Amino acid sequence: MAPINIEGNDFWMIACTVIIVFALVKFMFSKISFYQSANTTEWPAGPKTLPIIGNLHQLGGGVPLQVALANLAKVYGGAFTIWIGSWVPMIVISDIDNAREVLVNKSADYSARDVPDILKIITANGKNIADCDSGPFWHNLKKGLQSCINPSNVMSLSRLQEKDMQNLIKSMQERASQHNGIIKPLDHAKEASMRLLSRVIFGHDFSNEDLVIGVKDALDEMVRISGLASLADAFKIAKYLPSQRKNIRDMYATRDRVYNLIQPHIVPNLPANSFLYFLTSQDYSDEIIYSMVLEIFGLGVDSTAATAVWALSFLVGEQEIQEKLYREINNRTGGQRPVKVVDLKELPYLQAVMKETLRMKPIAPLAVPHVAAKDTTFKGRRIVKGTKVMVNLYAIHHDPNVFPAPYKFMPERFLKDVNSDGRFGDINTMESSLIPFGAGMRICGGVELAKQMVAFALASMVNEFKWDCVSEGKLPDLSEAISFILYMKNPLEAKITPRTKPFRQ
């Protein structure tokens, strides 16, 4: 038999036809299975779906996914069901009462995970704190991390953290002097986070410039790749497309680059206060050890740096708030010294600015989706094992019934002495509804360290510089983009002016 010769265009037409037919058949069978299970599962009502794409046609329009879902919640309520392209439905939670039911009241019931294929590459197939199901392995990992970032251990790092920050301030000033006072603070904030976390991971005295720069560059690449791979999350069959297969190859290559940077530092006699000491003392494979180190960098560096820059962006646009924050910091330091880590707990307005930033720009606005670990219930509805639940933190944090004027940046809403009469909303309700790091047993394990890192970076940068628009009247673009985390679509550029400091003269 003669070999079959298919021209390039014909091949792709046939391939696309096969994919579409396969997807239709798969979709129909999944819908049949879904509705058969509906006899024992009560799904919250949601928008109608279309074949193959599910509800994707209602999630576009040029708005971020968390905003589109929040808009649907205005129609379908605080809990509704959607299909995002694939063949598995998902419950979307959009108010604090329903969120507490899933995250707190039935925390163990909804403690499982479903890891996207692209992330399995860098998480040892979901064997890390954020992505593995709860159980002995997860509890042991979390316990080990907590032992390394407990308050006393973190405080013992403060002297080095303060020294690193002063070096960073000097670097920012030098950079600005070469560019007419204009700076992009994101990379500088990432560098500060990288240095502290490298000491948590490898030991307090650790210092290695090649690793800091190499891992930072690799993390940027991973964020880029994961954004390109989102198609395969919605349509599982899309992972066979050439573009998606390239994303997979690129992610493996980037992961291996990081592993090669980490491997030389796994040596005998590691410092007992390092996270790597804990990891190597367990019966973990090298892949799990590497993936855990990568997770701490991945979740800690970008999230803290992005949050600090979001806060700076608000302060550039709200000069009165920036000056009020500066006066508080200056009153604490007397204008005679840099900010110290111990100052942070004595700066209530700084904490309010932090809370308001995390409210308006939660770093993971859709959190990490939860999965029912067993058959359970939700507000009296039967939910079968394996059901996905997504908590829309953005919608919860922008609920006008909880946060009056939710789209206005108002740190005062979190100050008891200013908001004692409730004019900015009920402060107790707002505090309990602010869950940027999640809640319950799956709350972010490094939440306290993350808040300290952001607060210290923000306080130091405001103490040292006045932050202004690049040109008069041109406010920062607060448009959002999302990959692992929520970051600025157009990174902040600002003009900085060194504040007069006697200790620098």
UniProtKB/Swiss-Prot annotation:
MF (Gene Ontology): heme binding; iron ion binding; monooxygenase activity; salutaridine synthase activity
Any coiled-coil regions, as ranges: none
UniProt cross-references to InterPro entries, sorted A to Z: Cyt_P450 (IPR001128), Cyt_P450_E_grp-I (IPR002401), Cyt_P450_sf (IPR036396)
Location of this chain's protein in the cell: Endoplasmic reticulum membrane
GO biological process, one term: morphine biosynthetic process
Catalytic activity: (R)-reticuline + reduced [NADPH--hemoprotein reductase] + O2 = salutaridine + oxidized [NADPH--hemoprotein reductase] + 2 H2O + H(+)
Cofactor(s), names only, from the UniProt record: heme
Chain's gene name: CYP719B1
Name of this chain's protein: Salutaridine synthase
Induction: Up-regulated by elicitor treatment.
Keyword Hydrolase recorded: no
Stated role: Cytochrome P450 monooxygenase involved in biosynthesis of morphinan-type benzylisoquinoline and opiate alkaloids natural products. Catalyzes the formation of the morphinan alkaloid salutaridine by intramolecular phenol oxidation of (R)-reticuline without the incorporation of oxygen into the product. Can also use (R)-norreticuline as substrate.
Residues annotated as transmembrane: 10-30
Keywords carried by this UniProt record: Endoplasmic reticulum, Heme, Iron, Membrane, Metal-binding, Monooxygenase, Oxidoreductase, Transmembrane, Transmembrane helix
Native source organism of the sequence: Papaver somniferum
Enzyme Commission numbers on file: 1.14.19.67
Annotated family: Belongs to the cytochrome P450 family.
UniProt keyword annotation of Ribonucleoprotein present: no
